[in-house]
Amino acid sequence: MKEYFNDIEFKVKDNLKLKSNLKNYFESDGFIAVENEKDQLLFIKKSTLLDGWKLNILNWEAKINIEVKQKDNVVIHHNVKTKGFGFITPVAFSRLFEKYLYHLESYINNNECYKSKNIELIKLGKIKMLKYIALLILGIFTGLCLGSVLENMTGIELLGYLGVIIGFKSTEMMMNKYLIKKNTLQHSV
C-alpha cells in the first residue's frame, strides 16, 4: 500500500507559544507527543488492524515530525500509512491532510479557531471513505455473481468463494491504482 508523505514549511510570526500551540493542536485530535526536544517535536498515532476501515482519517497510523529552524521557521514532515487487508490508500486523502496542516499554520500565525474546520475535514473524509467502501462492496457483489455463475456451470463450490475474493481484491487494486494516479497527477501540476 502506498504511503502518504508530505513536507510543509511555513514562517512563524510569534515563537513564544509555538510549542504549546503545536501540542494543543495535535493532541486535540488524539496524537501523542513522543519526542519533545528543543527544536523538534514528534507526534504519532499508533496503528491498529482496522486502520484502513476507520472512517476518521485522522485516526490512521501517522507520524508528524516537526522541526523548528531559526526560531521563526517550522518544517513539518507528515507520514500516514495503512497496513493490512482491504485498505484504501491514504494518498486518496492527500488534499484533506494538506488542509489539516494549513489549518495548523492559520492557528499558529493568526490564532484562528481550527476545531470546526477540522471537524468539517473529518466529515469530508468520512464521506469519501464511505464512497470507497461502497465501491468495494459493489466489487464483492460483482465477484459473488460471477463466482456463482461459474459455480453453477462447473459444479465446483470453491469458485463461488473465489469469486468474492477476486471481486474484492481486484476492486481494491484498481481503485487504489486510480486514486494514487489521480492524486499524484494533481500534485505534479
Give the location of each predicted region.
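Ser/Thr-rich, low-complexity intrinsically disordered terminal regions
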Residues: 1-7, 15-131, 142-151, 167-189
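Hydrophobic alpha-helical transmembrane segments
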Residues: 149-165
